[in-house]
Structures are given as C-alpha cells and as structure tokens.
C-alpha cells in the first residue's frame, strides 16, 4: 500500500515531466521555429500591415459591399462579451425547439429583405460561432449585391470567389467553402 | 448524398487498413517483442522505471493490480485538482484567470482522470494554458494509458497468462504508443493550421471596425492526444468544431481516424495475443457492421434535415444547425457516431442540434459502450459480452459454459453482471432524480422530449466515460458537478476492478481439454448471437429512455 503510493508519486512526477513538459515544449519549439504562421493563429494583415483577423476565424459582416457570414451564437467573438479571452459557442437549439424556428424565420426574412435567397448555411448558425466559410451557393446568393455595391465586373468577382473557395480535401473529403474574411479582404485590396 | 456516403466508405476503408497495423504493433509491444522504437524508448523507460523505484516487473495479483491502478489514479487526480485550484498563482496565465469553483475543479479533475473529459466549462474562459497543458494534457496520456493497461491485463488473464504489472504497462502505453503517435500527429496538425503558442489571445480590429478577441494557445500537442487517447476534452469550449482545433478537412480526416484506431486495433491485438487472430477479426467485423448501421441512421437523418426549416427553404436541405460548412452534414454525422462509439467525446458539430435519429444513435452508442468502445475498456467490455453469450448459449444446450478452454462459473457471471449493471445504475438513477426536479436541478435548455434526452445524455456520457454532451444543458452547478462525478467514478472504476478480478480468476483456472461438445466461439454463428445479445441487453435496459427522448421528438417534428 505505502509502496504503491510511493511508486505512484514518483511515476506521476516523471510521467508529468515527459508528457506535460518535454512533449509540449518540443511541439512548441517546432511550431514557433518552423511553422510560425500557423503556430501563432494564421493571423493576416491588410494592405497597411495592420492585423485584421485570422484566416481561419470568421467575422461579422453587415455592409452591402461585403459577403456576409453565417449566423453566430457568440457574435464571432467580437465586442465586450468576448473580452479578454475570446469565446466560442453554438446555439445548442434542438430541432424541435420553437426558438430555432422563430430565429430562422426572422433570419430568412432579413435575408429576403436584402434580396438574398436564403441557403441552409445562411439560416442555420454554425458549430463554433467562428465558422470562416459560407457555401458556394451562399456566395452566389450574395453575388449581385456585392457586385453592385462595389461596381465590380462579374467576371472579376467570380474569379475572386473561386480563388477564395477551399475545395474538398483531395477532391473527396468535406464540403467546399468560401472563406468570407479573405474574400472580403481581397475585395478591399483591389 | 451519394458523394457523402463515398466519403464515409473511404474513411472506414482507411480505418480498416490502419487499425490492424497498429493492433499488430501493440501486440508486439505487450508481448515484449522488439520494435523499431526500442533504441529511443528503452533508455527512456529504464529512466522512468528506475526513477519510480520499479526495479523488477513481477506480474501482480488482482488485489495488487487494482490497488496500483486506483492509487496511481488517485495521486494523479489530486495533483491535477491542486493545479486547477492554484492556477491563479501559477505561470502561463495571460488572461489573468482565477481559480474555478471547487466543485467545477473537482468535476474536471475526476472527468479527466477517468478518461472522460466531460467539460462543464469553456476552456478559453476558465483554465489557464498551464492548467490545460500541464494538468489536463497530462491526464490525457495517463488516463488513456490506464485504459490500455487494463485491457492488456484483461486479455492476458482471459488467455490464461498472468495479468502483468500495471506500472510497466502504463509506462509502455505512453512511451511506445501514445507519445510517438502524438508527436508525429501534433506536427501534422501544426502544418494544417492548429496553433501552438504561449501568446495570449490576439486582439484585432475587424474589417468592419469591431474588436475581435481570437483565443489561442498551445493547442496542437493537446489536440492530437485528445483524439488518440479518446479523451475528447477541447482546448476551446466548442471543441473540434473550433477552426483552431480542426481547421480543415485534412485535420478532420486525421482526427476522425486517429480517435478510432486504438480501440479498433486492440481487437486485433487481442486476436494475436490469444493466438487466435480469426476470433479477433470476427469481433472486429461484428462491431464494424453495428457501427456502419448506426452511421447510416445518423447520416440520413442529418441529410434529410429539419422538416420545419425545409418548409422555409422551400426544399430539402441538410440540417446545418451547429455544424461547420467545411465538414457539412456527412462528416459531422460520421464524427458524432465515432466519437460517442469510441468514448472519445470530442465533437466537430453540436450534438444538441442533431436531428432525432442522430440523438438516437449517439445515445445508443453511449448505452452499448462497445461500438469500438473506450480506450481499452471497450475491448474488455466486448469480451464480457462474449462471456455472457457463452453462458446464455451454454444454458440453452445444457452444457457447462466454457470460454477459451476455461469454465465460466458463478464468480465470472457475478463479475460480468456487475460490469453490465453498473452502467444503468450510474445513468438511470441520477437521471430519475434530476428529472424529478426540473426547475431546480435539471438545467434543461430545450423544451419537450429533447429535455429528457439532455439529462439522460449527460449521465450516460459520464458513466460511459465519453464526455460529449447535449451542451445546451446548464451543467456548471453544484448538483451537476457532484452528481456527474458520481457517474464518472462508478462508470470507470467499478468495471476496472471487476475486469481485473475476472481476468485474474480466469488465468488461475485449470484449462479444460477441448472435446467434440466444446462450443467454439470463433464462428460467425456465435459472433452473430453475441451481436444479438448485445443489442437485446442494451435495448431492454435503455429503450424507455430512447422512446421518451429522441423517438418521441422525431414523431413530434413530423
């Protein structure tokens, strides 16, 4: 009993050093030295060199000249609620919850008022609340509005959308998605 | 829809290709044969053994083994509880987080030491980098290793060998299996875009001028052991749906396969260690078929979407509530079935927002516990079901039941029943108590039948040591933290103790020579009967909950 206790204490200490100190330190050093962009959160900058976000994290867009993101239960970790740690979260509404239906009815109305034909991903809120993507169909639904607001030739806008669409992995796994932030940043930088 | 099922088929093919490789490797490790890691691992192991005061590795008796497992888990749990309670004074706390409430810290420590990783908190707002990497990340290795060690001891006992030395198997599981794979996997995840930094959250001004706080941290090394060790506790609140935990479909593929590869591989390991690979493969395919059926149910449900919302859309669209665009309906459904089946508990989409078939399947996974099953323990439960089936079929034909040439007697059946019965006890009794006080205790966030699922799911997840949840539930309360802790402990340690005594007892029995009347367990017929026994026993116990929860909700939606 006592012997077991002593062995447990000593092995806990040694395994802790191995798995909670040495192992993370190795990954941290490799990350910071070899892959600093990814290791620090894939932060991207605008034309002035100002950090405007992360290529992997979505943002809220409301202006006519931007593509809009999906609904987020946490407002894309923006504003006072997110300070200082940053947050993530989902609605966790059940399919049978009346709140889901009324929220989606309101969202569909808002989109239709702005001449956007609702797609599933634009009505349903995302899992992380930070989803950087919309479906290609959702981008097409907003095409005319953005083209008009920015007076951008349709071919140019289409090629920008294509450029910022991430396809399936190996052409098979997952669903294609248009990265809203990098697309909007590219629109600003034209 | 076809494209979706092609994705599922390919991922399952990858699993079938990789799990036996790992299974064979694990068998080599625990049979003491040489592997290509010897040169690096052996000096490291000698150092750990010498430093821990383990000079020889005699096989332990059941009592000795159990006390070693329980005491070491207790020491680790207390150590982590103390780190969590004093995190405010410890380093790597860039956002100045204070200590959590004692009951939350207690629940967290128990949840991680039991390989469950049920989280009544959001990582980014509650625990410091030191607590996450130094306390929780540590338990992710040791709790998974404890599970593997117990499974190996169980396999040894069943096949008539001495059960082995707990500390030796614990250390070998880490140095030979968990740590090497994690190191490679963490680097792959880094390349894919998962951060690994000690810098605090990035504060940025968005394109529209709002202020956004982007949580970061040492995620990559944490993420891979989270999946590999079937731990499932996210660095961030929203787990593997978070783009920093699971940024793209390369990462998602890696994480999906790696969470299943050890429990699937351990079945093959068993076949090799028992000298009967055929039996291993039969069980493998039995689980595979059950798994495939459950995937199909969940995936079709998500694909057909929510009828109420489809009316607004004017067409049938998949249910995307709580899902990420990049994963879509199919990879979220596959993940949901895999994570609840394997007791990983990580999520890449919200289970609370799954359609009723998805809720049905995830709950069924938690009730059955053998659709691959928990790290190590799942494989052991499979054999408990085999033993019970031998007993049932033996009764039918009036023979003394035997398994692997050893008689199944009263002691074995008592211990197997205990393993089987502790699960409903740890789920149904607290569920009943909690549902009796819906306003004060339950914290239900979704009305109607779904609320019953929320409460049952939380205890099922705790008792099965899974850790996923119907996360709308307001569960960071004194009641939930303490009552879920009861289910966590009962669901983990009662079966472990019973498994070890069962295995040790089997190992000490005189082998019975095989005769013409011996019931062979390595046949398709017997495996089919086992599958039937698993489903009937599971259904008899838990059908009322499934009917009151997801089934009723499904009828309500039409």
UniProtKB/Swiss-Prot annotation, chain A:
TM helices/strands, residue ranges: 15-35
One Pfam short name: KdpC
GO molecular function, one term: ATP binding
UniProt KW keywords: ATP-binding, Cell inner membrane, Cell membrane, Ion transport, Membrane, Nucleotide-binding, Potassium, Potassium transport, Transmembrane, Transmembrane helix, Transport
Entry's localization field: Cell inner membrane
Record InterPro entries: KdpC
Membrane topology note: Single-pass membrane protein
Keyword 4Fe-4S applies: no
Function: Part of the high-affinity ATP-driven potassium transport (or Kdp) system, which catalyzes the hydrolysis of ATP coupled with the electrogenic transport of potassium into the cytoplasm. This subunit acts as a catalytic chaperone that increases the ATP-binding affinity of the ATP-hydrolyzing subunit KdpB by the formation of a transient KdpB/KdpC/ATP ternary complex.
Family in the record: Belongs to the KdpC family.
Subunit note: The system is composed of three essential subunits: KdpA, KdpB and KdpC.
Name by which UniProt lists this protein: Potassium-transporting ATPase KdpC subunit
Lineage summary: Bacteria, Bacillati, Cyanobacteriota, Cyanophyceae, Synechococcales
Swiss-Prot record, chain B:
Cellular compartments annotated: Cell inner membrane
Family: Belongs to the KdpA family.
Encoding gene per record: kdpA
Membrane topology: Multi-pass membrane protein
Bilayer-spanning residue ranges: 2-22, 66-86, 135-155, 177-197, 253-273, 280-300, 327-347, 354-374, 378-398, 413-433, 482-502, 528-548
Coiled coil: none
CC annotations in GO: plasma membrane
UniProt keyword list: Cell inner membrane, Cell membrane, Ion transport, Membrane, Potassium, Potassium transport, Transmembrane, Transmembrane helix, Transport
Major localisation: membrane
GO biological process entries: potassium ion transmembrane transport
Organism listed in the record: Synechocystis sp. (strain ATCC 27184 / PCC 6803 / Kazusa)
Keyword Cell inner membrane: yes
HAMAP family: KdpA
Lineage: superkingdom: Bacteria
Subunit structure: The system is composed of three essential subunits: KdpA, KdpB and KdpC.
Protein name: Potassium-transporting ATPase potassium-binding subunit
Function: Part of the high-affinity ATP-driven potassium transport (or Kdp) system, which catalyzes the hydrolysis of ATP coupled with the electrogenic transport of potassium into the cytoplasm. This subunit binds the periplasmic potassium ions and delivers the ions to the membrane domain of KdpB through an intramembrane tunnel.
InterPro entries on file: KdpA
Keyword Membrane: yes
